[in-house]
Amino acid sequence: MKKIAIDAMGGDHAPKAIVEGVNQAIEAFSDIEIQLYGDQSRIESYLVKSDRVSIVHTDEKINSDDEPAKAIRRKKNASMVLAARAVKDGRADAVLSAGNTGALLAAGLFIIGRIKGVDRPGLLSTLPTVDGSGFDMLDLGANAENTAEHLHQYAILGSFYAKHVRGIAKPRIGLLNNGTEATKGDSLRKEVYKLLASDSSLQFIGNVEARDLMSGVADVVVADGFTGNAVLKSIEGTAMSIMGQLKSAIAVGGVKAKLGALLLKGSLYDLKDTLDYSSAGGAVLFGLKAPLVKSHGSSDAKAIFHTIKQVRTMLETDVVGQLVEEFSKESDAND
């Protein structure tokens, strides 16, 4: 049985969206147990009772405006902290939260801990492509500054995730840059390019540009945390703008626009599904000793369900256990 600790109080729509997503997951998957951390009475008002769901009550939670490291240290009974502690103590196999991103990353690093040999765990998410296959990208903001060695390690981590979680036999690795030529980019990008090109264990396809990401140019895209986060926000904003413009055009376009929308209803839903990255799950802080997944702060029940599904897949494939083994081999080889 796979045990998942969930911060029920994190996110814009907590605990309602969190608990409703849990209800869906419990019905869909018979091999998971959920531990919900938070206000018991509020959780119970939305929970469909199940012997595979338990509640650990706490009145304390980490707010969106709390300073991450301080919150983790001072709010020792916060729902997020207790969920992470359950993983560290072996009472749960993975942790999920839609709460304060910085605090969750801090909880992952300080409570769960990183895998030996991993210098900087990276925030990884599967983002949409026009063909629906998606691509994995990291780092999406766990680290504001990176070295070339960090990005080389992100390529290894991303390739490992794509193989074991998404089932891609030979993931194509691309380095996000301002041009596709090998000579493009600043000194960091040029150094990373050399490291990736010389690593025979990776299927490195070279530099990729931001404009080509959603066309599926690569299965894994590597970036420093600052750049990766900026690209993530751009993709999110573009998707929301496109859907907003379509809705507005239909609403004010009169009868012809509404008839056209009716005829294109199926295609419009397909477009919405393509741009909706929530169905791929949340962002993984990959490189920790256990799966830690951050769901978007605005997640609804559907997004929480898909994030639980993602965590279940990570546990089913034992991707973290295999990653520990892989890095221990590298560590032994370097000793």
UniProtKB/Swiss-Prot annotation:
Q: Which UniProt keywords apply?
A: Cytoplasm, Lipid biosynthesis, Lipid metabolism, Phospholipid biosynthesis, Phospholipid metabolism, Transferase
User: What subcellular compartments does it reside in?
Assistant: Cytoplasm
EC number assigned by the record: 2.3.1.274
Q: Quote the catalytic activity from the record.
A: a fatty acyl-[ACP] + phosphate = an acyl phosphate + holo-[ACP]
Q: Which GO terms describe its cellular component?
A: cytoplasm
The record's disulfide annotation reads: none
Which ranges form a coiled coil?
Answer: none
The pathway to which it is assigned is: Lipid metabolism; phospholipid metabolism
- Keyword Lipid metabolism recorded: yes
InterPro entries, per the entry: FA_synthesis, Phospholipid_synth_PlsX-like
Q: Give one GO molecular function term.
A: phosphate:acyl-[acyl carrier protein] acyltransferase activity
Q: Which GO terms describe its biological process?
A: fatty acid biosynthetic process; phospholipid biosynthetic process
Family annotation (SUPFAM superfamilies): Isocitrate/Isopropylmalate dehydrogenase-like
Q: Which HAMAP family match?
A: PlsX (MF_00019)
Similarity remark: Belongs to the PlsX family.
Q: What does the function comment of this entry state? A: Catalyzes the reversible formation of acyl-phosphate (acyl-PO(4)) from acyl-[acyl-carrier-protein] (acyl-ACP). This enzyme utilizes acyl-ACP as fatty acyl donor, but not acyl-CoA.
**Subunit (UniProt):** Homodimer. Probably interacts with PlsY.
**Which named protein is this?**
Phosphate acyltransferase
Task: Report the source organism.
Answer: Streptococcus equi subsp. zooepidemicus (strain H70)
Q: Which gene name does the record give?
A: plsX
